[in-house]
Amino acid sequence: MGLLALLWGSTFLWIELALRALSPLQVTVARCLLGAGTLLVLCLVTRRRLPRGRAVWGHVFVAAFWCNALPFALFSLGQRTVGSGLAGVLNATTPLWSMLLGLALGTERGLRPVRAGGLLLGFAGVVVIFAPWQGAGQAGWGALAIVAAAASYAVGFAYMGRHLVGRGHATLSLSSAQLLAATVLTGLSLPLGGRPPAHNAPAGLIAVVILGIFATGITFHLTYRIIAAEGATNAATVGYLLPVVSLVLGFVVLDEPFSPRAAAGMVIVLVGVGMTRRRSPGDAGPPAPPVDAPAEAPTRSGSEEHPGQIVR
């Protein structure tokens, strides 16, 4: 999980640099394309096959929209006015959205006072960062886009855990297929504003390559493995670690300012997220299933299949 936090936390730095060379939608398409290409090569090397069947691909495209295409585009759009460090802080709200979604779907039970307080405290921290009383203007809209991206991640994680994980497909096959689907979806958006000529910024183009291969392809596969092993809510808690990485990289590499208000908001958000992760012994779920599934694992009948359980 530490490696995933490091790779995911650096995403905001690479987006910031990539936007110096490409438009937001170009960055979105490029990272999906490079990420998909990276994982497809790994599939060839490991002899993994992509999932088959219309039903599976239907779920793949839905998950790709919520977990890849939409949040990737929102991050690129939001970071035109929001620094990489603050973007990482706002992305840390993903566990809060996952908890809200779990409550709505009935998968989160036993909302004790401390967890409810953490939920409220976390969103209070977001309000402090937004500072609507100061009239944030464009920066406020950018921050709103990033918060929406964090919420979209939560929806995507939950959908993946319910409809894709534990169906007899290797996580590498699923992550490859999902980024391939995201490439198709984001490619369709290029006529909406993603076709201006790229700027001649070598550092930005290098950042796009790193963003696509490592911060998208490898990172997304690791995310899928955690969802398979520990569930969607636990996968979302990686966001708890991202602000430290994004803030340090933003400050050291990009010399981004870090205001006292943003610092206070970050602390409030992280304390709130930490409170929501506190569980009593009775809240513990079933043991985690294996991390990966065989490429050709047989599946049981529909009545015996359980979402979130890897088919052995």
What is the predicted role of each segment?
Residues L7, T11-I15, L40-N91, V126-I129, ...:
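Specific transmembrane alpha-helical segments of multi-pass solute transporters/efflux pumps
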Residues Q26-G37, W66-C67, F72-G110, V114, ...:
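Specific alpha-helical transmembrane segments that line the substrate/conduction pathway
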Residues T11-L22, L34, F72-V82, L90, ...:
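Juxtamembrane C-cap of transmembrane helices in multi-pass membrane transport proteins
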Residues L39, L100-L101, L111-P132, A150, ...:
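Hydrophobic transmembrane alpha-helices of multi-pass small-molecule transport proteins
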Residues L39, S98-L100, A104, G135-G194, ...:
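Transmembrane alpha-helical segments that form core, pore/gating elements
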